[in-house]
């Protein structure tokens, strides 16, 4: 059913497509945004106790339902501002259980929100403290455990890696993305 709307003397804009979001999280990181503006690197912020590892700790302590409710509030905020499509990354889980929890929340948002949602698996967002001395062991977990489970449950449309100094190397990134490619 098509409806004609007279837009004479008006402006019509297409909706915004936000291709990089982290809408599922337990606590905001605005202070870190100020630190980034002041020139601190992500690595320096992490050394101060902030960053992705702190977000992962808080997310681990938060229920799936709480994550969904707070994320939906943010979804409605961006809808009101004109967003019509959004990519939502995981990446604050940093273990299989919590990454899957995030992706399930994103899938629920996909089913219940009025906008187009794409899920992005970002298990390679930071190296958990327990793997700092052996990051390749964590990369192996991403490749051999996380990616197969994400694929089996069809929880993600895309896969992503945070390739940066102090995080994942070019070689790690290639290994992870090639593993993801095997699952489509």
Question: What residues fall within each predicted segment?
Answer:
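Glycine-centered loop/turn motif at secondary-structure junctions
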Residues: 41, 49, 82, 181-184
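Metal-coordinating catalytic core of metallo-dependent amide/deamination hydrolases
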Residues: 55-70, 76, 84-184
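Metal-associated gating/positioning segment near the N- to mid-region
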Residues: 2-69
């Amino acid at each position: 059913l098509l409806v004609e709307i007279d837009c004479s003397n008006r402006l019509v804009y297409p909706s915004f497509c936000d291709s990089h979001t982290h809408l599922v999280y337990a606590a905001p990181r605005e202070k870190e945004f100020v630190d980034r503006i002041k020139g601190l690197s992500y690595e320096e912020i992490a050394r101060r106790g902030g960053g992705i590892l702190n977000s992962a700790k808080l997310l681990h302590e938060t229920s799936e339902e709480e994550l969904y409710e707070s994320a939906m509030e943010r979804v409605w905020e961006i809808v009101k501002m004109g967003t019509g499509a959004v990519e939502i990354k995981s990446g604050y889980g940093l273990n299989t259980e919590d990454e899957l929890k995030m992706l399930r929340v994103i899938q629920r948002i996909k089913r219940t929100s009025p906008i187009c949602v794409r899920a992005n698996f970002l298990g390679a967002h930071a190296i958990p403290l327990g793997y700092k001395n052996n990051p390749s062991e964590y990369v192996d977990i991403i490749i051999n455990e996380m990616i197969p489970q994400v694929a089996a449950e069809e929880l993600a449309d895309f896969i992503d890696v945070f390739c940066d100094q102090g995080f994942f190397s070019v070689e790690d990134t290639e290994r992870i993305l090639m593993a993801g490619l095997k699952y489509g």
